Swiss-Prot record:
InterPro entries per the UniProt record, alphabetical: Aldolase_TIM, His_biosynth, HisA_bact_arch, Isoase_HisA-like, Isoase_HisA-like_bact, RibuloseP-bd_barrel
GO terms for biological process, alphabetical: L-histidine biosynthetic process; L-tryptophan biosynthetic process
Name this protein carries in UniProt: 1-(5-phosphoribosyl)-5-[(5-phosphoribosylamino)methylideneamino] imidazole-4-carboxamide isomerase
Keyword Transcription: no
UniProt enzyme class: isomerase
Domain of life per record: Bacteria
Gene coding for it: hisA
Pathway: Amino-acid biosynthesis; L-histidine biosynthesis; L-histidine from 5-phospho-alpha-D-ribose 1-diphosphate: step 4/9
Organism of derivation: Geotalea uraniireducens (strain Rf4) (Geobacter uraniireducens)
Sample GO molecular function, one term: 1-(5-phosphoribosyl)-5-[(5-phosphoribosylamino)methylideneamino]imidazole-4-carboxamide isomerase activity
Amino acid sequence: MIVIPAIDLKEGKCVRLEQGLMDKDTVFCDNPAEQAREWERQGGELLHIVDLDGAFAGKPANKSAIEAIVKAVRIPTQLGGGIRDIETIKAYLDLGLSRVILGTAAQRNPKLVEEACKLFPGRIVVGIDAKNGLVAVQGWAEVTDVYAVDLARLFEGYGVTAVIYTDISRDGMMQGPNIDATRALAEAISIPVIASGGVSSLKDIENLMAVESAGVTGVITGKAIYTGAIKLAEAVALTKKCRQG
């Protein structure tokens, strides 16, 4: 399992939200590229970037900040938020991103995921955000009647690199991840699952490591590493030690 530091972008700045609410944001850094370098220095092996403005607008909104981040680090990067078509996927991959995340578009147009996986093999991730087990879209502003597990099963055989599962009710709340829901999703599909939302301590990471055998291969952490509740370097060392046996 790897620990994946997150950078959420709003109006060009690095912020964190509570439960995905845009009016409950805290600005942590005015220079996202420098923040990305810091996470790389602390041992981050993959950087998770979210274009929050893009997620709500349905189109890219922080391109200059994203480009600056990609140029600033050598580690792989993945981006989600406002990516709704093949043209945007290609543009971001051409920018230097390692892979892109389809969220709202994946729920509304699964065929886009299939097409993208064929055009860009190994570079497409699906983000499934859920509240009480139901998929939320449009920057979490809209909860659907589709169950997360049912949506994830749609993508079996498409060639999706990973599914990022976020429990919205836990995100930014520092209350611990939803281990049971994450494990259940991982057991239901053959696609690797990355856990997100609520990670607040090294103990939370250890608890997720305990379900790695179910197919949970990574954990995204945001607020905890910005507030100091988790030191990224310590979290990385913990998971590396486990990987090395």
